[in-house]
Amino acid sequence: MAKKNKNVLVRLVSTAGTGVFWVKKRNPKTQTEKLSFRKYDKVVRKHVIFKEEKIK
């Protein structure tokens, strides 16, 4: 049998308010703080901060 995966999927939502998001995996045991990345938002055509939200 395969091992159970401990990673959880999180949704990184743009702070520009455009509704653009990226989905990433994160291990809650090793990464306890919330993720935030500076990634490209294709709606505003700029790099903006994306912050973590739970996937509903």
Curated annotation (Swiss-Prot):
One matching Pfam family is Ribosomal_L33
Set out the biological process GO terms recorded for this chain's protein: translation
Keywords attached to this entry:
Ribonucleoprotein, Ribosomal protein
Q: Which InterPro entries match?
A: Ribosomal_bL33, Ribosomal_bL33_CS, Ribosomal_bL33_sf, Ribosomal_zn-bd
State if Nucleotide-binding is listed as a keyword.
no
Question: Which SUPFAM superfamilies does its entry note?
Answer: Zn-binding ribosomal proteins
| GO terms of molecular function | structural constituent of ribosome
Is Translocase a UniProt keyword of this protein?
no
Which superkingdom?
Answer: Bacteria
GO CC terms, sorted: cytoplasm; large ribosomal subunit
Q: Which HAMAP family match?
A: Ribosomal_bL33
Q: Can you tell me which family this protein belongs to? A: Belongs to the bacterial ribosomal protein bL33 family.
Q: What is this protein called?
A: Large ribosomal subunit protein bL33
Q: Tell me the lineage of the source organism.
A: Bacteria, Pseudomonadati, Pseudomonadota, Alphaproteobacteria, Rickettsiales
